Amino acid sequence: MLFWAAHLLLSLQLVYCWAFSCQRTESSPGFSLPGDFLLAGLFSLHGDCLQVRHRPLVTSCDRPDSFNGHGYHLFQAMRFTVEEINNSSALLPNITLGYELYDVCSESANVYATLRVLALQGPRHIEIQKDLRNHSSKVVAFIGPDNTDHAVTTAALLGPFLMPLVSYEASSVVLSAKRKFPSFLRTVPSDRHQVEVMVQLLQSFGWVWISLIGSYGDYGQLGVQALEELAVPRGICVAFKDIVPFSARVGDPRMQSMMQHLAQARTTVVVVFSNRHLARVFFRSVVLANLTGKVWVASEDWAISTYITSVTGIQGIGTVLGVAVQQRQVPGLKEFEESYVRAVTAAPSACPEGSWCSTNQLCRECHTFTTRNMPTLGAFSMSAAYRVYEAVYAVAHGLHQLLGCTSEICSRGPVYPWQLLQQIYKVNFLLHENTVAFDDNGDTLGYYDIIAWDWNGPEWTFEIIGSASLSPVHLDINKTKIQWHGKNNQVPVSVCTTDCLAGHHRVVVGSHHCCFECVPCEAGTFLNMSELHICQPCGTEEWAPKESTTCFPRTVEFLAWHEPISLVLIAANTLLLLLLVGTAGLFAWHFHTPVVRSAGGRLCFLMLGSLVAGSCSFYSFFGEPTVPACLLRQPLFSLGFAIFLSCLTIRSFQLVIIFKFSTKVPTFYRTWAQNHGAGLFVIVSSTVHLLICLTWLVMWTPRPTREYQRFPHLVILECTEVNSVGFLLAFTHNILLSISTFVCSYLGKELPENYNEAKCVTFSLLLNFVSWIAFFTMASIYQGSYLPAVNVLAGLTTLSGGFSGYFLPKCYVILCRPELNNTEHFQASIQDYTRRCGTT
């Protein structure tokens, strides 16, 4: 809306000048050429005086010391192109193109030129019409202007008429908006691509801490905005950003303040997205402030402009890299300019003060050149001239299609701007092996050169160090071609904080994400290079040490069969089983002997069988835990040992009853013997323990589990039984049985020698208590894969103690002291006990 308001205001201002001051239409030679169809060319042959105006007058362009050599070359490029097309028999064969060229040195001159071309031939005004389809003007298309600010104004004025406007230098993204600027096209790539190239250039060197300077106007301000919006999400921080004012002067307070802030920003890299006019003011201020040792990244408008390189002292500011539209040559342009200089030797005719001629179509310097002092056609101007060349050819091809031209003739009918615009959008042709075409936004795809300034003393040139293709943008840079300003030709570093060490994540300090502290990642987390601000946790099956950048697979551990400790325990358990089976065979062979009968007779086989069951449970502790193994290992051992303790308890209790209570309490003894008290106790005790185990298996079912918490780098495969309520109930029952056994054996400590088992039983129970105390102590401090081995060792010690304390002495008598295994010896022992009891 601001643009439209400005356009309307300027139009009203210019009407005053037009109506009262501009009565003559004389022009300097070379500004116009008659033809069947005319093109309007808008070029800045002079610079804007940037003066403050108090009256709505059009700026006079032809002022001393304001000549613009670059605009002159573009002016000549259009003249050359039209002449080349007119001399061609393949393009517009019987049609002659003409032109009206204008010097648009200022915004007012630009608007004035646009309105003058749109005006009707006779009355010199623009008729207000309801339908603009049949609107006709002296030209069919515009070429230019040369900057975004002027192009926005011209495009807005021409848009309602759908008058084609093909610019050769206006690159701002805003001009791609077809709803605002429907008739605008360009032969220079959009700044949308330039911004992408510049951001990728920064990324390729790792520069993430930059300053950003733009020029006043659409080109610089929109370019800076687009660059910041694209750079920040990619990890680039803008430490300082400012705009060079339109009225900036070297040494004024505004520029001094900018230089101070730029120095305080501590950035090595400064991106200058500016038109060349304000860029010159900026760099003169840089030289004055002695801001050296930096890398300056140039936008295409000034990257290879001699207007900037001519600033005194600029060769000492540091390294200059830039983005430039790919270099192209216009064959014959230089010779054309030389012939023009030789042909035009007379001075232009004088124009009355205030006439149109003195405003927009007069170039006094153009007629004073010789072939020796004419403006040098450098690479920057030649590249821009080629885009003028493309623009004129694009219009010519569109007109060729609109007129239905054959190889020999074109139809001659009325041509309306909107019709020609449609055809220009459709053009697609080769021009010196380069494709010329437009997309739906009127933009053309091209290529950029990545350049670096090169100084040889006072002589300046530039080196093409790479290129950038578009859609998508891809950079190819040869970094070895760059001569850096620092020591040892090293690539400068531009960061707020140096990169963290491996395994350290960033904690942002302040408002810029490029300024951060480095904090080490904790164990179990790692730093993913795609997210440098967060240490990510490892997966369940993974682990990581402190300060890690990756996770490692956890080692799965369990008590394997082939482990040395496993082999030792298996061998010991197998030996115990063989001893138990051998003892059972030995007792069966000597079943009717006094030793076996005094040990319990048939009850011995139940005791040996329970020990065998407990011993067999140990094999389920080895190998990877499975459901059957977890169900069997602890309950089977606990039940077997409970039966053994029940038998041992009742055997000790029964001996006490026989020797001590049979005579003192005969009624109790008879009741106990008649009701099979010993067998009933064993059955009841074993049944209680069996019910505990069944409840354990149902309510707190042991099952295989993977334990992750104990060791960060290990996964322990185990069964969930040790900490369950069922295990504690079963273990408590066995403790009670052990205490009962100890009490009963202690009561029989004075029994006959052959029946006195107090010492052996106490030894067995002592081993039982010690082994399980050791196991639980170890389990509280060690939770590794060898814990099942400790469990087996404790159980094996318990069973071995029970076997050795009760059965081993009897086996010794049977095998080694057979003379003691007879009735006479046992009777003598009983008689001796009776005599001792009688004396007391």
UniProtKB/Swiss-Prot annotation:
Membrane-side (Extracellular) residue stretches: 20-566, 624-638, 701-724, 782-786
Location within or outside the cell: Cell membrane
Keywords: Cell membrane, G-protein coupled receptor, Glycoprotein, Membrane, Receptor, Sensory transduction, Signal, Taste, Transducer, Transmembrane, Transmembrane helix
GO molecular function: G protein-coupled receptor activity; taste receptor activity
List of glycosylated residues: N86, N87, N94, N134, N290, N478, N528
Transmembrane segments: 567-587, 603-623, 639-659, 680-700, 725-745, 761-781, 787-807
Entry keyword DNA-binding: no
GO terms under cellular component: membrane; plasma membrane
CDD domains registered for this protein in UniProt: 7tmC_TAS1R1 (cd15289), PBP1_taste_receptor (cd06363)
Subunit architecture: Forms heterodimers with TAS1R3.
Function of the molecule: Putative taste receptor. TAS1R1/TAS1R3 responds to the umami taste stimulus (the taste of monosodium glutamate). Sequence differences within and between species can significantly influence the selectivity and specificity of taste responses.
Family: Belongs to the G-protein coupled receptor 3 family. TAS1R subfamily.
Full protein name: Taste receptor type 1 member 1
Gene name of the record: Tas1r1
